Amino acid sequence: HMRDESKLPQVRFGTWVGGDRDGHPGVTAEVTAETLERLRANAFVVLRKQLVALSEKLSLSQWMQPLPQSLITAREKVAEALGERARAVLSTNTSEPWRQYVELLIERVPIEIVPHQVSQLRTGIGSYEIAEELAKDLASLRDSLTEVGAQRLADSDVRPVIRAVQVFGFHLAQLDIRQNSVFHAKALSQLMDAAGLDGSQWEEWAENERLRFLEKELRSPRPFLHASASAGPEADTVLGCYRVLAAHIARHGADGIGALIISMTRRLSDLLVVYVLAREAGLTRSLPEGLVCMLPVVPLFETLDDLEAAPSILGAFLEEPMTRRSLDFLSWNWGREKLPITQQVMVGYSDSNKDSGIFASQWGLQKAQARLAQLGRNAGVRIRFFHGRGGTVSRGAGPTHRFLEALPNNSLSGDIRLTEQGETIAQKFGHFVTATYNLELLLAGVAATTIEHERSVPMAPPLAPVLERLSRASQQAYRRLLDTEDFITFYRQATPIDALEHSRIGSRPSRRTGKPSLADLRAIPWVFSWIQSRFYVPGWFGAGSGLKALTEAELAEIGDQLRTWPFLYYVLTNIEASIASTDLELMNAYADMVEDPALRERFMKIILDEWNLTREMLEKLRGASMAERRPRMLRTLKLRADALRVLHLQEIHLLKKWRGLRKAGDEAAAEAMLPDLLLSINAIASGLRTTG
């Protein structure tokens, strides 16, 4: 089995750089088209490089090795496909047939490499169209080497290239397309208006009215408008993107495109709207049974309320005739093989944390995944969870093996999708050894957890009523802080959020719509600003109050479960790590920037009281202090403390000066010193090894 590539664990890469337009006006249809082309070109660059390296190793001579008929046949077949292009290759390396064969394969790769220039896609007679063609030609090479006894060459040199073709295909990474449900609603409203159907009040329609209209529309393949017609800015934006996807599928197949992800999925109609928009752009097919969508439609549940509603929304979605047809169509993998019927569901860790606090967020995610997995089993559909984790504890980060162990029972069935943030990519995959380690950790962890889940019986989590009460009390404490009058003033003055809003380090604007409200602020700058000021509020606040709300007997039960329930261990260990990363001296130094002393004292008392309570309750629960139990972690933090303190104090000095210039109306001077301020932010982020 180990020599059969199809039996090895499968790993695939995805991206939404160039595909994620949720709140990012710069990601246009043209950007998506260019992204798909660049991904395809770079896949060919990677594969060509591997083929060139392979050809250099295959110096077997036909005078020393018998030439198998299988290689002669394979070489003739490739040469015939290339036509005249094969002539130059066949005139070289005439006594090294294996090398010559690989040179023919290189000629079939449709990429033009020009030194010191961007590689260009090229088309020509005999060029590869699909990755399976290259994989098949490489399999012929491997088999011919095995035939002449060169098994080691086949295993050590050819198999890794076959594996690269399996992993990267001709697309390098699948591009996901993400857009907000509100944007889709506006697009549909404009389409309806343009078609004379009066969609101006679409967002005011009751849900049952929406569903009646959408289900009726999806029984017909007829679009609203001619392809050349314009319906409005949102409609044109969505349809422009979808038409790029449809054109790419028509030319190259769907391997390079992931899913249509709908952020802020709040109701069933948010998903069905996407089917109607896909029909308008030619992203559907009309089969005898009815319309099918050529790409998966994936809900993204982000807030605590949305996670609560997720099972009922997904259950209704899976009952929709178009959903069932589309899932069955996609399960045939474009005619290659029959795969299990699978519905992908994305769960977000950031917004639920920002709205409700760390414990309520984690418990809400745990419950939602368990219920969604059970719903899938009842419907005969495999649920593939896509975990939108960030680079910090408050946004779902943590040790990979602990994260996998903490997943709800029976929620992992052999495959999983995870996001990796920009700052963690360099840390985890910047070097060959660490990249290998982290990928192996993920593959082994998924395999082990899947086996564990298959052996276990689905059951309610232990202590569910106790954790429900803990979660509710922690959420109330967290919301009390955020809802306290003048909190936004304290937050904006005690953290560098205003400087972060002027930076260009994120992939999207810091606010969804530009409104200066807490609700409109994205989770990443929210977390980043608290980390920079060493409060780490999103990573621990509310946990102490939640634990304090329990009885002594309930606390003792939680203490016992810590040893046997990975979820509880994972969450409380991460909260403890956040508490350890705070710095009281620096918290006070940042708070000193708050102009109103009474306001400063009021909020610092709330935060420090909860900080002390959380430490106290964690020590009580664990039966020992952090210094006794986790000396290595504290030693690691201490090693960086002095250097970081200098950087923090410099940042505070620069922030005060920058804010003073802006307050005085000297925008030119403020703009001139912004690079120094952003440099200090970057230095602190590097020292802490995290942003948001």
What does each model-found stretch correspond to?
Residues P97, P110, Q174-L175, N180-L272, ...:
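Active-site cores of enzymes that catalyze phosphoryl transfer or operate on phosphate-rich substrates
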Residues R3-S6, G14, P160-V161, L245-A250, ...:
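Generic recognition of flexible, low-complexity loop/linker segments
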Residues V27-L58, A281-Q476:
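Catalytic or ion-translocation cores adjacent to nucleophile or general acid/base/metal-coordination motifs
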Residues H1-E215, G232-E234, G258, L295, ...:
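Often metal-dependent polyanion-binding catalytic scaffolds in large enzymes
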Residues R87-L90, P97, H171, D176-R178, ...:
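Acidic, glycine-enriched catalytic cores built around paired aspartates
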Residues S61-Q69, D155-V158, P288-L291, R384-G388, ...:
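Short, glycine/acidic-rich hinge or "gate" loops at secondary-structure transitions
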Residues M2-D4, V273-V274, T392, G398-P399, ...:
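Flexible, glycine/threonine-enriched loop-and-boundary segments that flank and lead into catalytic domains
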